[in-house]
Swiss-Prot record:
NCBIfam families: ureG (TIGR00101). This is Urease accessory protein UreG. The keyword Nucleotide-binding applies. It comes from Yersinia enterocolitica serotype O:8 / biotype 1B (strain NCTC 13174 / 8081). Keywords: Chaperone, Cytoplasm, GTP-binding, Nickel insertion, Nucleotide-binding. GO terms for cellular component: cytoplasm.
Length: 221
């Protein structure tokens, strides 16, 4: 929010969702959005691409009838999306402020961006919290490679766990290594196709980012 703002609009939580290309960031957004809406949360979505708005178009198609397409905005960065969410987030800050102005009753904005390998982080001027997404197909050694995105993220998502047997990856090893490099910071294993771990991820977002009471599993309306 602009420091000079004196209006009474509520603070809309900004959540960055980053990770390597192909890790499943867009898929994560597509599966958690209907659950958030079902639980009474009003989301907005911003995606980042270099020279297109293809991710935004994909999300609009997938969430048609679930989320008004005007609440999904694509940003063409013209350069590495990594730069546009960390070193110079001005384009994304402008996009966020535009969405906040248009939809002031929203509860959260998800800002999706790819980045270089494991180095992507979000400027605190842009995101209040951020989720980093990796996938099993990258190999079980990925957590051991550290990287600021993987280590510092508020939540680490290890996605596409169904692919583990096909790429020779051990989920036990990945979990063990994740605990070593992240310490007490939370992580979760997910499968967007089956929904495994997705409700739990939404629980974490609501509890840790939105500070909303979360019902025990199985009690969601």
């Amino acid at each position: 929010m602009n420091s000079h703002s004196t209006d009474k609009r509520k603070k809309i939580t900004r959540i960055g969702i980053g990770g390597p290309v192909g890790s499943g960031k867009t898929a994560i957004i597509e599966v958690i959005t209907p659950i958030l809406i079902k639980r009474g949360i009003k989301p907005l979505i911003i995606t980042n691409d270099i020279v297109t708005t293809e991710d935004a178009k994909q999300v609009k198609r997938t969430l048609k009838g679930i989320l008004d397409e005007e609440k999904i905005l694509g940003v063409e960065t013209g350069a590495c999306p990594h730069t546009a969410v960390r070193e110079d987030p001005s384009m994304n800050i402008a996009a966020v402020e535009e969405m906040e102005e248009r939809f002031p009753d929203s509860d959260l904005i998800m800002i999706e961006s790819g980045g270089d390998n494991l180095t992507l982080t979000f400027s605190p001027a842009l995101a209040d919290f951020y989720i980093y997404v990796i996938d099993v197909a990258e190999g079980e050694k990925i957590p051991r490679k550290n990287g600021p995105g993987l280590v510092q993220a508020d939540i680490l998502v290890i996605n596409k766990i169904d692919l583990a047997p096909y790429v020779g990856a051990s989920l036990d090893v990945m979990e063990s290594d994740t605990k070593v490099v992240r310490g007490e910071r939370p992580y979760i294993l997910t499968n967007c196709k089956t929904g495994q771990g997705i409700e739990e991820l939404v629980d974490m977002i609501m509890r840790d980012f939105l500070f909303t009471h979360v019902q025990p599993q199985g009690e969601h309306a």
